[in-house]
Structure formats: C-alpha cells, structure tokens
Swiss-Prot record:
It is found in: Plastid, Apicoplast; Cell membrane. InterPro entries: ZIP. The gene is ZIP1. Its main location: plastid. This is Zinc transporter ZIP1. It holds the Pfam family Zip. It catalyses: Zn(2+)(in) = Zn(2+)(out); Fe(2+)(in) = Fe(2+)(out). It is a multi-pass membrane protein. Keywords: Apicoplast, Cell membrane, Ion transport, Iron, Iron transport, Membrane, Plastid, Transmembrane, Transmembrane helix, Transport, Zinc, Zinc transport. C-terminal histidine-rich loop acts as a negative regulator for Fe(2+) binding and thus determines selectivity for Zn(2+). Residues 1-7, 75-91, 208-213, 268-273, 332-358 are extracellular.
Amino acid sequence: MDLLFAKIICIGIFLVVTTFGCFIPHLMGLYKEKENEEKNKRVKNILSNLNCFGSGFIFSIIMFHLLPETIHIISDHGNIRIFNTSDSQMKILYIFFFVFIGFCMQLGLEYVLPVDTNICCVSNLDSKKKLEDTLSQHITKNASTTVNIEMQNIDNIDHIHEHSCEGVHTHDEKSIGKFLEILTLQSFFLTISLAIHSCIEGMIIGTSTDVNYVFISSFCILLHKWIAGVTVSLSLNSNNMNKTLKAILLLTFVFASPLGIVLGHMAKSAGQKVTCLINAVSIGTLLFIGCEILLNEIKQNISRKVRLCKWLSFCFSCLIAFALISFTTSMAPHTHGDIDTHVHVHHHDHDHDHGHNH
C-alpha cells in the first residue's frame, strides 16, 4: 500500500473516532441517571482496563520503535549535524535533550497551565469517573464525595465577576469580564492542551516512512483518543459557554490529529534531521502521557486483585505491541536512503579506482 494513501486512511479514521468520542455522552445519555448498578460496574472495569491497555501500547511504541529508530538514524548518518556537531554520542545526547523538552512541555500543559489540576491524564480519569458516576442510580447533583472541578471553577468565576463589577456597570468592563471568564475556564485550557497533544501525536504518524508503522502508531494513539473526546465533550457541556465557541473548540480538537499527520508528512520531506527532532519531542510527550495514565489507574484506592488486573492489562498490551513491532521489523526491515546512497557512491568510486589502476 502506498504510504501517502495509508496516512489518508488514518486521517479519516482519526476524524471518525474523535468525533464519535465527543458524541459518546449524548449517545449513551450520560447526563441522566441510570439504574443498572451491574452495568455501571462493568463499564467502570472496561474503562479502567482499556486505559491501562492503551498506556501499554503508548509505552511500547516509544521503547520498541520510536526511540531506537531515532537514535539509529542519528548515530548512523554522519551528514546530520545537531547544534553544529556530527559526533554520534553528542547527537544522541541532544536527542534525549529534545525528549526532555517534550516531557517538560506536557508537564507544563498538565500542571502549570490549568487553574486547579492537570489536564490530560487526570481529566481523562475524572471524565471516566464522571461516566461511571452518571451511570449509577445513587448519583445526586451535589454529592459530597465527588469534586466537580468544572462547576467549582464556574462558581469562582461568577463570584470574581460579581465582585469586580460592584459599582461599575460600563460596557467595556463587562466585555473584559466575559473575555477573562472564557480564559479562566478549565475547559478552555483542557481543549487547547489536548489539541496540542493530539497534533504532536499526529506528527509521529506523519513522519513515519513505513506503512506498517503508520497503522501500528495509529492504533496505539486511537486506544486513548476516544476518552479524550469524552473529556472535551463533558467539559464543554458543563460550562455556560457560547455555542459558537464550543463548536470552534470541538472542531479544533477533532482536526488536531489530522493536522499533525499533514504537518509531519510535510516535515518528513525537509530531511531526517527535522524528522528525528520532531520524533524526540513527541517521545517525551508520549512518555509522560503513558506513565501518567497508568499511575493514575493503579494508585486508586482499589483492591490488590483489581490492581493486578490493570497491571496485567498493561503488560499484555506491551507484549502484543512488542510482537507486532518485532514481526513488522523482521518482515520489512528499515532501509535508510542516506546510508544506502553513501555505500553505493563508495562502491562506485572503488570500482572506478580499480578500473583506472588496471
């Protein structure tokens, strides 16, 4: 199959899965109470194990494919220079520096940018809990055991807005207040940060040079993509935000991964140096996401048996990913154009010198 055609197929799949994830709350009627407690428990177990399974695939695609391949390309290509050096050891060190940049960037998006809590992983976990809670017959609007971060933010915003407008009723200040209200909404930062994260994930697919790895990487990312769509949908629907702005934010999130695939494919033509640096930043981002999802699942106040099941889901997905990557590599090993060209030129020069001597 043609590489470009494979990426186009993945773009279509991402659009469908992401859109479906955003509509899951509406399709399942999650804003209403349900009375089937057994169904609630089953959904809870499926969501938890699916999160652990997805984090295992994320971890595996980093450790067994992206990181080794990036290091291999950088170390074997003497013509690639990073920060004006062609030394292999220094270039590998710089690659890990860009991994560190990606890790810190995702850390900032989750723990520095938000108002109250981190965005991607814990919000996904909160959304998962919200999905579970709304399916339970014992849910009440003001349950004391559940902390509704979004509504708490709105109450704080309303209080700040009322306090700031005491004695002042000018049109300009009201407009500024509405603008600040939007910026301080947790859901606004949540959607933007998840869109950035999705775009970076898409770049990994876009920079791939092998059809098999395009589909493997897509499968790895799609395993947790739907829950991100649920997160965005639940968050936006819990705020009194303008419908136009909601639509813009939803479309931004839905088209983020396809945009990343397109940008990654364009960057691939810029050379292997750019591809390796993009992959390094993506590795740092995915490493943070994969570990954070797993830790948030396992550290919950649950029994040892449930923890064991989640750990086994993680390990099982890692083994599946390792088997897929090993099989793909053995069936269609990578060939790097620059190395082959260098060997061909060297061989041609050697034959030319040999003929000249005779």
